[in-house]
């Protein structure tokens, strides 16, 4: 397994390495940090919108107005939500690589030592990875059924809506320690 992990890391490193000028270059560090923050704001902002605004207020919306949300607003918001998640994880991994801490952070400093900064950024990266997985492989497939984007009977729609909501709530709870870990890594160490 370790050989596969090392091989995978080498493949990722080789695929994004566009020359030695890319790694540790302040310009690219800034560009990818900026893109990471912008895409993260999009992703987590929509996550919090769904959990703190849309879901709690759906019972207050008259039935004749609910299709406006389920057929127009929710699918558009979910597009930005899932692609915000994708952009966040991709830019975060690139940022970890060009700053030289990707391997140490992703192994939580267990392989090759590391600093508290790399440990905390690694915790944040793993929480973000779990959240990204939930978005793409649990929330989105279930939302497609719940919103009628793909065919499903009423029982499956209801079960899918509940599953998507529970995993969305899980991501909301994970977002707090994820953000804390990211901020502490950048500001205390």
List each model region and its residues.
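Juxtamembrane inter-helical linkers in multi-pass membrane proteins
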Residues: 57-68, 146-158
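Lipid-exposed faces of alpha-helical membrane segments in multi-pass integral membrane proteins
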Residues: 35-38, 42-45, 83-90, 94, ...
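Membrane-interface interhelical loops and short amphipathic "cap" helices
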Residues: 18-34, 101-118, 189
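Interfacial and helix-entry/exit segments of alpha-helical transmembrane bundles
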Residues: 65-91, 156-177
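Single conserved hydrophobic/aromatic residue that forms the stacking wall/gate
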Residues: 1-7, 11-12
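Functional transmembrane alpha-helices
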Residues: 27-53
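Membrane-interface helix-loop-helix modules in multi-pass inner-membrane proteins
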Residues: 50, 54, 59-61, 75-139
């Amino acid at each position: 397994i370790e050989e596969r992990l090392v091989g995978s890391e080498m493949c990722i490193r080789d695929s994004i390495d566009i020359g030695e000028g890319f790694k540790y270059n302040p310009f690219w560090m800034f560009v990818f940090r900026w893109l990471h923050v912008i895409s993260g704001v999009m992703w987590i902002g929509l996550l919090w919108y769904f959990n703190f605004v849309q879901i709690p207020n759906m019972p207050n919306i008259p039935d004749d107005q609910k299709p406006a949300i389920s057929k127009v607003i929710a699918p558009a918001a979910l597009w930005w939500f899932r692609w915000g998640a994708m952009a966040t994880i991709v830019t975060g991994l690139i940022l970890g690589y060009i700053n030289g801490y990707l391997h140490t952070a992703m192994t939580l400093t267990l392989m090759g030592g590391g600093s508290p900064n790399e440990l905390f950024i690694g915790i944040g990266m793993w929480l973000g990875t779990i959240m990204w997985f939930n978005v793409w492989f649990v929330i989105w497939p279930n939302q497609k059924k719940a919103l009628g984007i793909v065919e499903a009977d009423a029982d499956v729609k209801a079960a899918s809506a509940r599953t998507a909501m529970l995993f969305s709530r899980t991501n909301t709870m994970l977002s707090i320690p994820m953000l804390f870990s990211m901020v502490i890594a950048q500001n205390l160490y």
